[in-house]
């Protein structure tokens, strides 16, 4: 369940499905990798990725803050952080470009599609979402 961090209310279906056309907002998403972990004695690499909605997209979706945080647990220990981030960004944007609209649920679906690979074991999500109240 996704909640608004200001009011602690659950996000409604209308708020989650609210979308805009992707060509109306230039550079709608900002991708940031803030940690790469290599646990000892395993063949696992954990990528901590944050997707931020830019100002124009937040304004169009009536959001105050939208940070989507993901931990991607992979068996791919060859890819560096920047290599995996570029691949991840490309797959997410490919999905959204094909869909044509961008919103909260569509970005989460795009991440689910981008991480549906044989080398990905788990994807953990922790989102920071605040809607404009005023």
From Swiss-Prot:
<protein>
    <recommendedName>
        <fullName>Replication enhancer protein</fullName>
    </recommendedName>
</protein>
<keyword id="KW-0945">Host-virus interaction</keyword>
<dbReference type="InterPro" id="IPR000657">
    <property type="entry name" value="Gemini_AL3"/>
</dbReference>
<dbReference type="GO" id="GO:0016032">
    <property type="term" value="P:viral process"/>
</dbReference>
<comment type="similarity">
    <text>Belongs to the geminiviridae replication enhancer protein family.</text>
</comment>
<dbReference type="Pfam" id="PF01407">
    <property type="entry name" value="Gemini_AL3"/>
</dbReference>
<comment type="subunit">
    <text>Homooligomer. Interacts with the replication-associated protein (REP). Interacts with host proliferating cell nuclear antigen (PCNA). Interacts with host retinoblastoma-related protein 1 (RBR1), and may thereby deregulate the host cell cycle. Oligomerization and interaction with PCNA are necessary for optimal replication enhancement.</text>
</comment>
<comment type="function">
    <text>Increases viral DNA accumulation. Enhances infectivity and symptom expression.</text>
</comment>
């Amino acid at each position: 369940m996704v909640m608004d961090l200001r009011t602690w209310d659950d996000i409604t279906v209308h708020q989650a499905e609210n979308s805009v056309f992707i060509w109306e907002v230039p550079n709608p998403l900002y991708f940031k990798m803030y940690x790469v972990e290599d646990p000892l004695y395993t063949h696992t690499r954990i990528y901590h990725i944050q997707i931020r909605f830019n100002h124009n997209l937040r304004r169009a979706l009536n959001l105050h803050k939208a940070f989507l945080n993901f931990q991607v647990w992979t068996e791919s220990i060859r890819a560096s952080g920047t290599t995996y981030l570029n691949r991840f960004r490309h797959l997410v944007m490919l999905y959204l470009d094909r869909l044509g609209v961008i919103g909260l649920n569509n970005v989460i679906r795009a991440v689910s599609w981008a991480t549906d690979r044989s080398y990905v074991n788990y994807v953990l999500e922790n989102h920071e979402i605040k809607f404009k109240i005023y």
